Amino acid sequence: MDKKSLYKYLLLRSTGDMHKAKSPTIMTRVTNNVYLGNYKNAMDAPSSEVKFKYVLNLTMDKYTLPNSNINIIHIPLVDDTTTDISKYFDDVTAFLSKCDQRNEPVLVHCAAGVNRSGAMILAYLMSKNKESLPMLYFLYVYHSMRDLRGAFVENPSFKRQIIEKYVIDKN
């Protein structure tokens, strides 16, 4: 088995078929200005203690937040095993990086705050990784977020796309 196949096998094996985690209900601060949440967290964003400048909506449904100055960016993504989310990784990670650098709080969400938004957060954290061991960093971030939030990037296709871009292609 070659190195890339081994990495992919080990990463998918160590993050699949785990105990069923509960869907998260709380919003999680991921970096100084990047937050991960669900649809309810987005609806509550205008009254949040965090003064969000942006909400990144990854659900299929477009909405507004009445009486709010929050900018909503909508990228409609389906949570299934055929959606190619990897084509959005570069733009989303660049946007989140700018939000962090400019101290502009952003909430990234999907319906449950697990798969679509979790995948974009994992991609963002992997894109910031300057370590020489992306496989270990992937496992560290994945398990840390799962411990913190409960269910996190349970969609095997989304995990595979992140592994291919940020782990396999880095080696």
Swiss-Prot record:
Cellular location(s): Virion; Host cytoplasm
Phenotype when changing residue 110 to S: Loss of activity
Principal place of residence: virion
Keywords: Host cytoplasm, Host-virus interaction, Hydrolase, Inhibition of host innate immune response by virus, Inhibition of host interferon signaling pathway by virus, Inhibition of host STAT1 by virus, Interferon antiviral system evasion, Late protein, Protein phosphatase, Viral immunoevasion, Virion
Molecular function GO labels: phosphatase activity; protein serine/threonine phosphatase activity; protein tyrosine phosphatase activity
Keyword Plastid among UniProt keywords: no
Record region (Dimerization): 1-27
Induction trigger: Expressed in the late phase of the viral replicative cycle.
One GO BP: symbiont-mediated suppression of host JAK-STAT cascade via inhibition of STAT1 activity
GO cellular component labels: cytoplasm; host cell cytoplasm; virion component
Tyrosine-protein phosphatase domain segment(s): 23-171
Record-linked CDD domains: DSP
Keyword Membrane belongs to the record: no
Broad enzyme group: hydrolase
InterPro entries: Dual-sp_phosphatase_cat-dom, Dual_spec_Phospatases, Prot-tyrosine_phosphatase-like, Tyr_Pase_AS, Tyr_Pase_cat, Tyr_Pase_dom, TYR_PHOSPHATASE_DUAL_dom
Location of the active site: 110
Gene3D superfamilies (UniProt xref): Protein tyrosine phosphatase superfamily
Domain of life: Viruses
EC number: 3.1.3.-, 3.1.3.48
Reactions the enzyme catalyzes: O-phospho-L-tyrosyl-[protein] + H2O = L-tyrosyl-[protein] + phosphate; O-phospho-L-seryl-[protein] + H2O = L-seryl-[protein] + phosphate
Subunit structure: Homodimer.
Biological function: Serine/tyrosine phosphatase which down-regulates cellular antiviral response by dephosphorylating activated host STAT1 and blocking interferon (IFN)-stimulated innate immune responses. Dephosphorylates the OPG144 protein.
Family statement: Belongs to the protein-tyrosine phosphatase family. Non-receptor class dual specificity subfamily.
Stated name of the protein: Dual specificity protein phosphatase OPG106
Organism: Vaccinia virus (strain Western Reserve)
